[in-house]
Amino acid sequence: MRYLRPIPKRLLTDDMLVWPSDGEGGFDAVRMVRHVRFEREEQLCGDAHRSADGGHGRVFVDAVSSAGAFEIPAGSRVLVGDNPSMVVESCKRCCVIRGSVHHWELVVR
């Protein structure tokens, strides 16, 4: 598997605003990343009448198909679609065999 195709744009239906963490507790200037995918993770509470906050999940950013893509540092704040803003807990770089980045997976809360 020497080459892996980019994630098709038809699957990347969301746009995302990013306030990158500056590493000192603040944020750098806002950046737009178009064509990302947000997959929400629903969690159930012990109370059978309600569910937990739906603002958790994963964001997939393709290195080729996502316009403005970059490696988003943990601690950054993101706004995807009409969801509330979320904080990036981790950013996993997914590479092809030759070491180039195929996509990033962000865990957001």
Show which residues each predicted segment covers.
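Short, conserved turn/kink motifs that form compact alpha/beta structural patches or helix kinks used as
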Residues: 21-109
